[in-house]
């Protein structure tokens, strides 16, 4: 995720996410550098890439190498979720990506987690080196 730091400079940080109905959800601790930055500059840019595969036309020709890939760039504004039930719903979405186990959350943990909600305002996609059947 790309954000603007307190001095107006670009700042990028990897974060776990979940996506549902045009909204990207992220989570973090309740305070810290990222939270301060987003409170001042709520506009963010989030990018995802998948399917990286090195391909080439000629093994000994460096310029013939490229990377097959798909990517998405999303822009939006961060809103912090405060509702406890909504926080649990988002935490469940995040956890279901990593485990089939049913997860429980301690009340203090839910209260202290910062849930980031980004409604996607703009989205662009790109693929490189993929056949239509691979998209």
Question: What spans do the regions from the language model cover?
Answer:
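Short beta-strand segments
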Residues: 1-30, 46
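A broad, low-specificity signal for short, low-complexity segments enriched in glycine/proline
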Residues: 4-10, 34-42, 75-82
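A sequence-composition feature that detects small, non-aromatic residues
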Residues: 12, 18, 39, 62, ...
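Charged, gly/pro-rich active-site loop segments
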Residues: 51-135
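Helix-adjacent hinge/juxtasegments
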Residues: 33-56, 63-65
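A generic structural signal for short beta-strands and their flanking turns/coil linkers
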Residues: 13, 20-22, 40-44, 68-74, ...
């Amino acid at each position: 995720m790309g954000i603007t730091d307190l001095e107006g400079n670009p700042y990028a940080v990897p974060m776990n996410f979940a996506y549902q109905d045009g909204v990207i959800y992220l989570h973090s601790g309740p305070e810290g550098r990222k939270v301060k930055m987003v409170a001042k500059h709520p506009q963010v840019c989030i990018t995802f890439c998948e399917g990286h595969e090195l391909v080439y036309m000629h093994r000994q020709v460096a310029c013939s190498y490229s990377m097959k890939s798909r990517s998405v760039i999303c822009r939006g504004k961060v809103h912090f979720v405060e509702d406890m039930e909504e926080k649990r719903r988002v935490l469940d979405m995040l956890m279901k990506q990593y485990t089939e186990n049913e997860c429980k959350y301690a009340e203090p943990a839910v209260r202290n987690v910062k849930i980031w909600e980004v409604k996607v305002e703009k989205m662009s996609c790109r693929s490189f080196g993929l056949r239509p059947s691979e998209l």
